[in-house]
Amino acid sequence: MKRVAVLLKTVMCEFLKCDYNGYDRIISLLRRILTLICTPNLNGLTIKRVIDSMQSLEYIKQTCNFKLQMCISSMAFKRNNALQNCNHYAWCDDHCSDIGRPMTTVRGQCSKCTKPHLMRWLLLHYDNPYPSNSEFYDLSAATGLTRTQLRNWFSNRRR
């Protein structure tokens, strides 16, 4: 039970650091759950209060999943808008090949699984978006990117 109290306290601290609208209800629910769990008379809790706290936790989970889905979908929307400009580049490539000039080299893109992993890290560390050396090492091992590539990705994302 003490672990749950520590976990909820940590979650509450994380939500307090975030600056999203609509999280006021989540913070009040977390405080209510924390006071329910930390009461010295745990045997005096009724089943209804425990069920209410579980429903509150489920509400928090659904809200967090919704916010995460909104962030991911907005990133996908930006990516789709960027892909619409590809027709212009295709025209340039055809035009350059007709003239006889060599086409420029295109740099490689991050893999599809790398970007969500890095965005998830960035969302979790919203208050301090600068990874430490050990975090760079972990991210490099997880994504397969070099430290320089990671540093460039984070600096571009923070702009």
Swiss-Prot record:
The free-text function statement in the UniProt record for this protein reads:
Mating type proteins are sequence specific DNA-binding proteins that act as master switches in yeast differentiation by controlling gene expression in a cell type-specific fashion. Required for meiosis, but plays no role in conjugation.
Q: What is the lineage of its organism?
A: Eukaryota, Fungi, Dikarya, Ascomycota, Taphrinomycotina
**Protein source organism:** Schizosaccharomyces pombe
Cite a single Pfam family from the UniProt record.
Answer: Homeobox_KN
User: Which key words are in the record?
Assistant: DNA-binding, Homeobox, Nucleus, Stress response
Query: Which GO-annotated molecular functions does the record name?
Result: DNA binding; DNA-binding transcription activator activity, RNA polymerase II-specific
Q: What is this protein called?
A: Mating-type P-specific polypeptide Pi
Main localisation, per the record? nucleus
This entry carries the following GO cellular component terms, namely: chromatin; nucleus; Pi Mi complex
InterPro entries for this protein: HD, Homeodomain-like_sf, KN_HD, TALE_homeobox
| Location in the cell | Nucleus
| Expression induction | By nitrogen starvation.
Please, what other remarks does the record include? Answer: There are three genetic loci for mating type genes in S.pombe, mat1, mat2-P and mat3-M. Cell type is determined by the alternate allele present in mat1, either P (plus) in a h+ or M (minus) in a h- cell. Mat2-P and mat3-M serve as donor of information that is transposed to mat1 during a switch of mating type.
Could you say which protein family the record assigns here?
Answer: Belongs to the TALE/M-ATYP homeobox family.
Q: Which gene encodes it?
A: mat2-Pi
Where DNA binds (residue ranges)? 103-159
Q: Name one GO biological process term.
A: positive regulation of meiotic cell cycle
